[in-house]
């Protein structure tokens, strides 16, 4: 059997802290795997298959923040961050979809490799985000207001144009631009079966998946 390296170990559920520009950055890391002084950071997520297929930018941001915290923790050791992974537990995994599509996750639990940033990008991101929160705190102290989160942070859906039959809610087809919707509507009207089978175009403004009304989950 192989003799393990002195630093080899697994650390589960550890919360780390680091001071950045006078503020405390904190993160709870699900799993740290150290092998031959190389650290793999693993985060567990219950998510959808589509999140794995299309990816989520916030995963990359989150795990690189964990990488920053680990780099501070192991600063005076030989241990270096080597890789970042998401262990995705897919609540909606479908065996039939996996058999039909190569790009569909092939198991209900999969590992997703996350890009590890270089030190310059990582330090810049951490510094910028801390600065943004500090500025927001100053504004709140002055006039009681916070800046709004960005559309990406609020998971805003894109605007769409739905071609639908008059008085019916269900769309015949939904488009990402008005011009395409108009072309489809024109072609549909040419081949309609009944004189009263009229259509209309309904504009659907992009909604926020997060932060509906006065609710904020952050």
Whereabouts are the PLM-identified features?
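Short, charged, amphipathic alpha-helix that recurs within catalytic cores of restriction-modification
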Residues: 58-69
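Metal-dependent nuclease catalytic cores that hydrolyze phosphodiester bonds in DNA/RNA
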Residues: 1-39, 50, 54, 99-103
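Short, solvent-exposed loop/turn segments at secondary-structure junctions
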Residues: 17, 47-49, 89-93
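Metal-dependent nuclease catalytic regions and adjoining charged, substrate-binding loops involved
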Residues: 21, 68-218
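Conserved beta3 VAIK motif of the Hanks protein kinase fold
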Residues: 42
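Short helix/strand-bridging catalytic loops that position acidic/His residues to coordinate divalent metals
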Residues: 46-58, 109-112
